[in-house]
């Protein structure tokens, strides 16, 4: 779920903090992805073959990212916080899985993801807790350029740049959210923003009844904290949950994941290893895997040749996807907007 109606609030109250992008705009960028969210997309799109379909989807999508010169970093969930247990059980029931089948808790499936990504030469990190929290932390400390996720709680965890709908299709429209610009537009401190997210509704506790996005924002601007809101809210129209665990939720959003800064490295995919895993041990067709790898090698060769041409012409910059596909009008307009706004004040996220 993430944060209830946060995207709605941003659309109406802070549109300057979001913009439309294309996948080519992230050529050369390092992007962190919550593996469970990527896997869930393939589970819903390709029912049946519980383990194969997500692995096949992960294989094809990762190759597409690499072809676009994106450096993906996949993060696996660790042990979920106890505050999220009820939410996970509810999700499992709604999808028809048992909780043990969920990618959040399936250690065997996590090992298969690790093996696949290792064979593809892509880094994969096991988070101590929520993968989303570690993704946000990596963006906050500058290890990655952005987080690709459909869950808005990336922003509540302090992720500086969130990408939604990054699905590896060249013509798809991606929505990019900037946390510093969002705080500026809403005129909130980061700590106030986290309390706003809890008021809107998150995965870790209940929420005050009857508070919509506009009302919650108004109350936080007036009273700055949840404690201040509780002192002034009408409890008849906005009942406060019994034994409300909002402080635990707040702590989870503020908490820094206990993990050493990862050393990230990418390498060429191991085609024979991939064929052995996906086609010999799993029932994916070998001709499909080899055909996709051939297309991938051709794209890499084309990029290298273009770089050589650029070097001969005295161009030392790294080649981007725009070198192979003409820039669209939207991309040129976005580039101009970025240059125009480059001098704006930035907020530091603690």
Curated annotation (Swiss-Prot):
Its cofactor is Mg(2+). Residues 110-223 are annotated as: I-domain. It is found in: Nucleus, Nucleolus; Nucleus, Nucleoplasm; Mitochondrion. Keywords: DNA damage, DNA repair, DNA replication, Endonuclease, Exonuclease, Hydrolase, Magnesium, Metal-binding, Mitochondrion, Nuclease, Nucleus, Phosphoprotein. Phosphorylated. Phosphorylation upon DNA damage induces relocalization to the nuclear plasma. It is an enzyme of class 3 (hydrolase). DNA binds at residues 61, 130, 201, 203. Mg(2+) 2 binds at residues 151, 153, 203. Its EC number is 3.1.-.-. GO terms for molecular function: 5'-3' exonuclease activity; 5'-flap endonuclease activity; DNA binding; magnesium ion binding; manganese ion binding; RNA-DNA hybrid ribonuclease activity. Residues 1-95 are annotated as: N-domain. InterPro entries: 5-3_exonuclease_C_sf, HhH2, PIN-like_dom_sf, XPG-I_dom, XPG/Rad2, XPG_DNA_repair_N. Its main location: nucleus. The keyword Thylakoid does not apply. GO terms for cellular component: mitochondrion; nucleolus; nucleoplasm; nucleus. Interacts with PCNA. Three molecules of fen1 bind to one PCNA trimer with each molecule binding to one PCNA monomer. PCNA stimulates the nuclease activity without altering cleavage specificity. Structure-specific nuclease with 5'-flap endonuclease and 5'-3' exonuclease activities involved in DNA replication and repair. During DNA replication, cleaves the 5'-overhanging flap structure that is generated by displacement synthesis when DNA polymerase encounters the 5'-end of a downstream Okazaki fragment. It enters the flap from the 5'-end and then tracks to cleave the flap base, leaving a nick for ligation. Also involved in the long patch base excision repair (LP-BER) pathway, by cleaving within the apurinic/apyrimidinic (AP) site-terminated flap. This is Probable flap endonuclease 1 homolog. It comes from Danio rerio (Zebrafish). The lineage of its organism: Eukaryota, Metazoa, Chordata, Craniata, Vertebrata.
């Amino acid at each position: 779920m993430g944060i209830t109606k946060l995207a709605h609030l941003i659309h109406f109250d802070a549109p300057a903090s979001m913009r439309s992008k294309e996948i080519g705009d992230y050529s050369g960028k390092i992007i962190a992805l919550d593996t469970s969210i990527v896997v869930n997309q393939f589970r819903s799109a390709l029912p049946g073959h519980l383990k194969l379909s997500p692995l096949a989807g992960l294989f094809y999508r990762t190759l597409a990212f690499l072809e676009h010169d994106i450096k993906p970093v996949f993060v696996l969930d660790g042990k979920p916080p106890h505050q999220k247990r009820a939410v996970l059980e509810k999700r499992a029931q709604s999808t028809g899985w048992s909780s043990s089948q969920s990618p959040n808790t399936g250690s065997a499936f996590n090992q298969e993801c690790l093996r696949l990504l290792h064979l593809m030469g892509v880094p994969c990190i096991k988070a101590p807790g929520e993968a989303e929290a570690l993704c946000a932390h990596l963006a906050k400390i500058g290890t990655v350029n952005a987080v690709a996720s459909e869950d808005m709680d990336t922003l509540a965890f302090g992720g500086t740049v969130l990408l939604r709908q990054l699905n590896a299709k060249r013509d798809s429209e991606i929505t990019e959210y900037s946390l510093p610009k969002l705080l500026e537009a809403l005129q909130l401190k980061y700590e106030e923003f986290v309390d706003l997210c809890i008021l809107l509704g998150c995965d870790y506790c209940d929420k005050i009844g009857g508070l919509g996005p506009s009302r919650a924002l108004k109350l936080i601007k007036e009273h700055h904290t949840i404690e201040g809101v509780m002192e002034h809210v009408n409890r008849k129209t906005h009942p406060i949950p019994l034994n409300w665990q909002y402080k635990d939720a707040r702590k989870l959003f503020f908490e820094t994941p206990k993990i050493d800064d990862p050393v990230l490295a990418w390498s060429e995919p191991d085609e024979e290893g991939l064929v052995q895993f996906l086609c010999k041990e799993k029932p994916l067709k070998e001709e499909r895997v080899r055909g996709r790898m051939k297309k991938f090698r051709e794209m890499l060769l084309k990029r290298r040749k273009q770089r050589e041409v650029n070097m001969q012409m005295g161009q030392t910059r790294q080649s981007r996807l725009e070198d192979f596909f003409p820039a669209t009008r939207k991309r040129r307009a976005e580039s101009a907007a970025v240059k125009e706004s480059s001098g704006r004040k930035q907020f530091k996220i603690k």
